[in-house]
UniProtKB/Swiss-Prot annotation:
Active site residues per record: 45
Lineage, top ranks: Viruses, Riboviria, Pararnavirae, Artverviricota, Revtraviricetes
Comment field on protein domains: The polymerase/reverse transcriptase (RT) and ribonuclease H (RH) domains are structured in five subdomains: finger, palm, thumb, connection and RNase H. Within the palm subdomain, the 'primer grip' region is thought to be involved in the positioning of the primer terminus for accommodating the incoming nucleotide. The RH domain stabilizes the association of RT with primer-template.
Keyword rRNA-binding: no
Organism: Cauliflower mosaic virus (strain CM-1841) (CaMV)
PANTHER family: POL PROTEIN (PTHR33064), RIBONUCLEASE H (PTHR33064:SF37)
Signal peptide stretch: none
Name of the protein in question: Enzymatic polyprotein
Domain Reverse transcriptase span(s) in chain numbering: 272-452
Catalysed reaction equations from the record: DNA(n) + a 2'-deoxyribonucleoside 5'-triphosphate = DNA(n+1) + diphosphate
Similarity remark: Belongs to the caulimoviridae enzymatic polyprotein family.
PROSITE patterns registered for this protein in UniProt: RT_POL (PS50878)
Record bears the keyword Protein biosynthesis: no
Length: 679
């Protein structure tokens, strides 16, 4: 016989007789074949372990004997036995069906008690001043209005009166709340000094944040394998393409200072149980890096060179999210929170067969990882797959890029719920977060290297710092590649970047020996001088009309995405994105009209995530393009390229607006900015 500690008859009757002003009642509805709908006032009791119903609200034929009767201790210390249960009952709340696996029969003075097992099944359970919220199918919240008065209908003769075609009069309901029920500051209540706050006027105070802080505390730790918090549900396996080969890379030489640093870091990793001594036939060298990020935190970072192992293992093709797609999810959102997984990859356990493949050498010996280490090519895809599995159902208000989690909402009240749901999911799966990196309830937030603020976005300040700190004289092709990589990262914010890059890009060709001249230094200085800041770009809302403006020259094309923002009857065109590129060798031989058409096509491709499936405007100073769209090229085999372009453009819905060259401020702007660099 099972034993449970449960608020039952004596305690609940005591509560009801005193008329506890903090009681939570909600409307529920039951349907049974042959009966009219049964409407109940359900008591939500998170202190009760089980769901309990009166025998007078569920027909006798639906009750069965429990496989194992339950012995329940009640408030006065005595025990009672519950032997009747109702299986798989549907309780309709706020128009939604909530399935309850088991309801126990017990007379408590209340028709239906919703216990903690229900609250956990549809967690997170959150209480506001005028409502409670359960989460349906772990994906969307159901808002349920609280009752200010409650009655009991389940008394002798009630079920007989509820039978269809019954002529028995329904017994008079019994009032079980003689006073108006008030709501406590319990769970995450939104009540301040007796003052009810509307959704529009909600301010997050320390008191209202208390429960969020408690949830955050449950999932945060400095140990990514914290035994009190991890569920170890993330697992991974790595396979060699040729299992018969041993992958060995010769050890490195280390300075006395590096040896001392390795001593500290290896001990830390052993204490965390993320590595262990190894007898693996495989070997990769570990080394220390001390870049800007490491200097800021005052600690070198240990890195393992897995280049050879990555070539020898089978990859993982699971895609990482497209950053532009993630940004479209947050359009129009006003409040944000972000979370960082603590040493995310280390939360993924490797199976026993995979661990020897991660073996590395350092001054202290030969070790292998128990978890997925940084540097393995499969690591980002492995981790993203697990995170998508956990958070995919919350896509309407949450996006995840590897180990970065962003929660976004329209208002503070929604956000309170959304954050609670995400933290509850982390707790459920044992996903451990970094508390010091958590950003809560922000209107301005950093995500994916961007600063997102009031409908605009721009690269974070450190991107510009990296550009400015680059030396004017570069030493080799690798250094130049790093500089161009930073420019590419910020390409959405730099008009005609392709033209700016071209002279530098030419120095990376395989058949061109490395040489850095005074002219190159001057050019580098001018590039940096003209990139002293990135303008915040507008994040277009779904209802705003979009415009693309394009331009083409002999060797390059450029494009710009704009949105028309209507504010108090005034239309304002706001810049959303830039795009640019170089024409291929064959394309440079095209007629100027074809280059202008190709500029339009390339720009649409770049911004397709915004331009599908909306109707937009194409603005160009090329007179040919407007007629090109409507020309009939069918049957002319010499113009196959034009036919293909027309077919491709037909998948989009747009109007074309021709502007005079003298009015094409976009082209003038591009030329002016480019001339600044080349002058």
């Amino acid at each position: 016989m099972d034993h449970l500690l449960l608020k039952t008859q004596t305690q609940i009757e005591q509560v009801m007789n005193v008329t506890n002003p903090n009681s939570i009642y909600i409307k529920g509805r039951l349907y049974f074949k042959g009966y009219k709908k049964i409407e109940l006032h359900c008591f939500v009791d998170t202190g009760a372990s089980l769901c309990i119903a009166s025998k007078f609200v569920i027909p006798e034929e639906h009750w069965v004997n429990a496989e194992r009767p339950i012995m329940v201790k009640i408030a006065d210390g005595s025990s009672i036995t519950i032997s009747k249960v109702c299986k798989d009952i549907d309780l309709i709340i706020a128009g939604e069906i909530f399935k309850i696996p088991t309801v126990y029969q017990q007379e408590s003075g209340i028709d239906f008690i919703i216990g903690n097992n229900f609250c956990q099944l549809y967690e997170p359970f959150i209480q506001f001043t005028d409502r409670v919220i359960f989460t349906k199918n772990k994906s969307y919240p159901v808002h349920i209005t609280k009752l200010t008065r409650a009655v009991r209908v389940g008394i002798e003769g009630f079920l007989e009166s509820m039978k269809k075609r019954s002529k028995t009069q329904q017994p008079e309901p019994v009032n079980i709340s003689t006073n108006k029920i008030e709501n406590p500051l319990e769970e995450i209540a939104i009540l301040s000094e007796g003052r009810r706050l509307s959704e529009e006027k909600l301010f997050i105070t320390q008191q209202r944040m208390q429960k969020i802080e408690e949830l955050l505390e449950k999932v945060c730790s400095e140990n990514p394998l914290d035994p009190n918090k991890t569920k170890q549900w993330m697992k991974a396996s790595i396979k060699l393409s040729d299992p018969s080969k041993a992958i060995k890379v010769k050890p490195m030489k280390y300075s006395p200072m590096d040896r001392e640093e390795f001593d500290k870091q290896i001990k830390e990793l052993l204490d965390l149980k993320v590595i262990k001594p190894s007898k693996s036939p495989h070997m990769a060298p570990a080394f220390l890096v001390n870049n800007e990020a490491e200097k800021r935190r005052g600690k070198k970072r240990m890195v393992v060179n897995y280049k050879a192992m990555n070539k020898a293992t089978i990859g993982d093709a699971y895609n990482l999210p497209n950053k532009d797609e993630l940004l479209t999810l947050i359009r129009g959102k006003k409040i944000f929170s972000s979370f960082d997984c603590k040493s995310g990859f280390w939360q993924v356990l490797l199976d026993q067969e995979s661990r020897p493949l991660t073996a590395f050498t350092c001054p202290q010996g030969h070790y292998e990882w128990n978890v997925v280490p940084f540097g393995l090519k499969q690591a980002p895809s492995i981790f993203q797959r697990h995170m998508d599995e956990a958070f995919r159902v919350f896509r309407k208000f949450c996006c995840v890029y590897v180990d970065d989690i962003l929660v976004f909402s329209n208002n503070e009240e929604d956000h309170l719920l959304h954050v609670a749901m995400i933290l509850q999911k982390c707790n459920q799966h044992g996903i451990i977060l970094s508390k010091k990196k958590a950003q809560l309830f922000k209107k301005k937030i950093n995500f994916l290297g961007l600063e997102i603020d009031e409908g605009t976005h721009k690269p974070q300040g450190h991107i510009l710092e990296h550009i400015n700190k680059f030396p004017d004289t570069l030493e080799d092709k690798k250094q130049l590649q790093r500089f161009l990589g930073i420019l590419t990262y910020a390409s959405d914010y730099i008009p005609k970047l392709a033209q700016i890059r071209k002279p530098l890009q030419a120095k990376l060709k395989e058949n061109v020996p490395w040489k850095w001249t005074k002219e190159d230094t001057l050019y580098m200085q001018k590039v940096k001088k003209n990139l002293q800041g990135f303008p915040p770009l507008h994040h277009p809302l779904p209802e705003e009309k979009l415009i693309i403006e394009t331009d083409a020259s002999d060797d390059y094309w450029g494009g710009m995405l704009k949105a028309i923002k209507i504010n108090e009857g005034t239309n304002t065109e706001l810049i959303c994105r830039y795009a640019s590129g170089s024409f291929k060798a064959a394309e440079r031989n095209y007629h100027s009209n074809d280059k202008e058409t190709l500029a339009v096509i390339n720009t649409i491709k770049k911004f397709s995530i915004y331009l599908t499936p909306v109707h937009f405007l194409i603005r160009t100073d090329n007179t040919h393009f407007k007629s090109f769209v409507n020309l009939n090229y069918k049957g002319d085999s010499k113009l196959g390229r034009n036919i293909r372009w027309q077919a491709w453009l037909s998948h989009y819905s747009f109007d074309v607006e021709h502007i005079k060259g003298t009015d094409n401020h976009f082209a003038d702007f591009l030329s002016r900015e480019f001339n600044k660099v080349n002058s």
